Structures are given as structure tokens and as C-alpha cells.
């Protein structure tokens, strides 16, 4: 029956093309019509940007590069950002009232918000904490990166600065719980205080190598560490003690640390992850999706590290690569996979079973629904999408879920609210 229907569609489409040519319609019209016909029957989630979310922060606070995002079991949205952290791009001098640490204020605007920010579902800022504290029993990352709240309410933070070879664990209100790994463990024999140097060690069972992000597997009480900006592995840890239980590199092989050089489109697939290994997300069915960002690919494994398959995404993307972060739709089967692409500036929507890209939204720019360095992506219990932006983007955005509907364009552009059009 499906073949008969498909055959009829082909005949109808051919007739439309012939009719269009007879009336002298343009080739571009024909191409657009062909795309619509090809996508007939394809369904995907629909989203609209919420330009009024989140609400303004107090105290003239602003965000720096916003490089971590999670949604907890209360649908509170957590981000971590770099305000004026030493050694990072942070905020530009024109964004800060105090240009020189300890110096005078040059005006009212602005001050860096604390690194960890918690928003409720309505967009109100309800929590803020974090940063370096003199005499603290932990070492705040040189360059914090990634945040997640686990099933017990603990907050986990990584870091991708030079000295960041550890993970931190706090309570929801910022009380220190544990540090796993030692800061500075990746310093090599040539390193000096004046000129530090570092070397990866993806076989280290006690420390990490610039962690990008952690995924929480609540049922197994495990964390999947994307390790990351210096090491080349996924490391699975026990959430109670931070011990590494297992790890793997690309294709499920033991991780190695050779320098692969720059990614070159058209070359055979790299046999190891490039830096950074930017995410390791676990679906409900146990499939582990690893963001091999500069290799423009997702590698998929089972929980033991057995390689299943890989999917390449926009393989002509250079520099920082196309595969930045991954989240899943909120139906039980997690039918759809969402991907942040911070070079091409899209949120891509895939059918998860086939890993076919159905459509994408967003493009480069500063207005609501646009992106500059879209870095992290997460979903809440209602299926809404949240994104954060690094580099000069420096913000958090919300995209309201509007149900499932037909795909009318592969590239949607800005998903502007229907009520505002």
C-alpha cells in the first residue's frame, strides 16, 4: 500500500513540475516544491523562542561565557559561566564597572554574576554562588566548564583550564562536599611555576584531564565524564566516591594521547577522539552518545563502552567542529535527539533511531532565537529546550515546545513566536 501511495506522489509531483515548466515558473520554485514534497509526512518537534525568559538579574549582574547547563528534577535551570575568572576571556573591560581588580568603579554597570546561577521555571534567579574562596578546602577550576545536578541534589562541576584535572561536588546551596582528582596533576616534567606545561594521560585512574561535562546515570549511581579538553576519553565514575570504574576512547578502544593534528575533511575517520571530547550523554535505552566535537561526529556506545556506530554531522565544519552538546526529547522512548552546533549556529533535530537530521533552527546573530557560540543544550520535563552560548554570546535562552508537526523546511531559521509574527 505504501509503495502505491508513494508512486502516486511521484506521478503528482512530476505533473506539477511539468505544469510549472509549461507556465515558465522559476527553477528555484521547483526546487522549493521538491523539498516540500520530499519532506511530506516527516514529523518533528516544534519550538518557539521565549524572548522574555529568563527575567532580568539583580545587582547589575551579567554573565560571561556561559559554558554549562542542566535542568534539575524541579525544572530549575542551572548554568555556570565565566565572569572575570583569571586566565579566561571572561567579560570584556567594557562590561565591568571595576576594570582592574581592587581598582575604582568606572560606573554603575556592570558586575560579573557569581559563576553558578539557578533559575526557577518562571525565569526568576533563585540561587547564586561559587568562585574562588581563600582558604577553601577545594580548588575552584581555573576555567570552570560544565555543570550537572544529580538525583541526590548534589551539584557537579568540571573545568578546562590548564590546571584543571579534577571535579568538584557541592550541595545545591554551594556547600563543598568533595573534590575528585588533584589540580595540577597534568603538569609535566618540564613545567615550572613561571611557565607551566602539561601533558595528557588518558590512562590515569585517579585524576582527569580538563573535564568538559558529566552526565548522571541515577539508576546505576554513575557519572559519565567527558574527559575532555586534554585527555581523550569517556570515564565512568562512582558518584559516591569519584573512583573511575571504566573508561574508553574512540571505537571503544583504550584511549591514547597522540597528537592527531587538525581535522581535515575527506580524510579517513580518526581512530581516536580529538580534543575536546565534549559530551557523553546516556539515553533511557542505555545508548551512550559521545560528542567528538572537532571530528564532526557522534560516536554511540553501550554502557560498557562497546562501540555501536558513528554519525557524521556537517563534515566540512572546521575549527571548533559541529557536535557540541546533546539532549533528548522527553517522551519515554526519547524519539528525538537535539544537538547544539556552535560553529554553524544551529540546534539540530534528529530522529534518534536512524540518526537522520530532520530539521534545525537558529542561525548566527544576537537577537532572540539566534546564536553566537551555542554551547550547551538541555530539556525540562515539559519538553522545552534551553541553550547557553560561549564566546561573545554569553547568555541563556529558552525555546518553548509546541508539539509535533510536519517539517516544512530543513533550515527553519529563527523560531520566532507565532503570536509575534
How would you name each of these model-derived features?
Residues 7-18, 22-421:
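Eukaryotic scaffold repeat domains enriched in small/polar residues
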